[in-house]
Amino acid sequence: MSKQILILPGDGIGPEIMTEAVKVLELANEKYQLGFELTHDVIGGAAIDKHGVPLADETLDRARAADAVLLGAVGGPKWDTIERDIRPERGLLKIRSQLGLFGNLRPAILYPQLADASSLKPEIVAGLDILIVRELTGGIYFGAPRGTRVLDNGERQAYDTLPYSESEIRRIAKVGFDMAMVRGKKLCSVDKANVLASSQLWREIVEQVAKDYPEVELSHMYVDNAAMQLVRAPKQFDVIVTDNLFGDILSDQASMLTGSIGMLPSASLDTANKGMYEPCHGSAPDIAGKGIANPLATILSVSMMLRYSFNLTDAADAIEKAVSVVLDQGIRTGDIWSEGKVKVGTQEMGDAVVAALRNL
């Protein structure tokens, strides 16, 4: 029986980078006889334009029926003035929550070929390989009540809620420990337990889960210190587990240690490792349609999909090897280009990865 993959290009540069990722996926499908069937649909602004909502019910049904979802990016200034609850980003939040994609894996890896691209000194970031495990469907982004109210003095006050249940914390902590077990057996849990009640429960539950993983060295760090340490000495970290808000911020910070967010994929998984895969970067509307966006993060998201949702290690390794070969050849999109390298556009980069994969 064939495996179903839903392709959601999204907005901005999403369709451009997705075209290249699909080329790589189709070659891998043929080369390794993976038996994938691809279907395409819309999400975000593209869905608003077509259906009037950022995620149509039929699209959500297709996502539920699929074995994995590959996403480009959502959002753009075209939709910034519409009602908040139907903006493109709400489609992304909805598909995550409706599919139960609670565990977000965001690697921050510095490719040796791109050591000069980081804004930090080479000796600080050389060999960097961090995995941030972010809780994705709880916390302040989904908490209620939220809104704006008028105080007795006539002033408006906005408020949000940051709730976490024991079960939500326990399941994401388990993902963090599981990832640590197959990596360096080190896990740093990041919270704000000196201030937030939700973080105090977070720390308590993480400590409980740690008893099931005696081989893993567990440490705790406040989020403000973690942000500082990511810049001061990032290689002290191997796996970081944290909540939705902190993970959103820290994973973007960690991505820039590598020199370009355009290189970094991500995975969002449910309890059975069925997942949605997307680049860490956004829709970059300022460069959309120019053919200069870096497709490598989306291509590497295909590799993560093969690895985590389908356990196709050989095919996943081959795609990562193909990307490394292309970087060895000095081929670069503008965001990772440096003097003496060959600057190419989106399509040329995709073609180069396809050629490298074909020759492996």
Swiss-Prot record:
Cystine links in this protein are: none
Q: What is its EC number?
A: 1.1.1.85
> Which residues are listed under the site Important for catalysis?
141, 192
- For the ligand (Mg(2+)), the binding residues are 224, 248, 252
Annotated localization: Cytoplasm
- Give me the comment on cofactor binding: Binds 1 Mg(2+) or Mn(2+) ion per subunit.
Q: Which UniProt keywords apply?
A: Amino-acid biosynthesis, Branched-chain amino acid biosynthesis, Cytoplasm, Leucine biosynthesis, Magnesium, Manganese, Metal-binding, NAD, Oxidoreductase
Q: Which pathway does UniProt place it in?
A: Amino-acid biosynthesis; L-leucine biosynthesis; L-leucine from 3-methyl-2-oxobutanoate: step 3/4
| One GO term of the biological process aspect | L-leucine biosynthetic process
Q: Which residues does the record give as NAD(+) binding sites? A: 76-89, 282-294
In which domain of life is the source organism classified? Bacteria
| Catalysed reactions, semicolon-separated | (2R,3S)-3-isopropylmalate + NAD(+) = 4-methyl-2-oxopentanoate + CO2 + NADH
Enumerate the Gene3D superfamilies for this protein.
Isopropylmalate Dehydrogenase
Instruction: Detail which positions bind substrate.
Output: 96, 106, 134, 224
Q: Does the keyword Cytoplasm apply?
A: yes
Q: Name one Pfam family in it.
A: Iso_dh
Supply the InterPro entries for this chain: IsoCit/isopropylmalate_DH_CS (IPR019818), IsoPropMal-DH-like_dom (IPR024084), Isopropylmalate_DH (IPR004429)
What's a single GO CC term here? cytosol
Cofactors required: Mg(2+); Mn(2+)
GO molecular function term, any single one: 3-isopropylmalate dehydrogenase activity
Q: How does it assemble?
A: Homodimer.
Q: Which family does it belong to?
A: Belongs to the isocitrate and isopropylmalate dehydrogenases family. LeuB type 1 subfamily.
Q: What does this protein do?
A: Catalyzes the oxidation of 3-carboxy-2-hydroxy-4-methylpentanoate (3-isopropylmalate) to 3-carboxy-4-methyl-2-oxopentanoate. The product decarboxylates to 4-methyl-2 oxopentanoate.
Its recorded name reads 3-isopropylmalate dehydrogenase
Organism of derivation: Pseudomonas savastanoi pv. phaseolicola (strain 1448A / Race 6) (Pseudomonas syringae pv. phaseolicola (strain 1448A / Race 6))
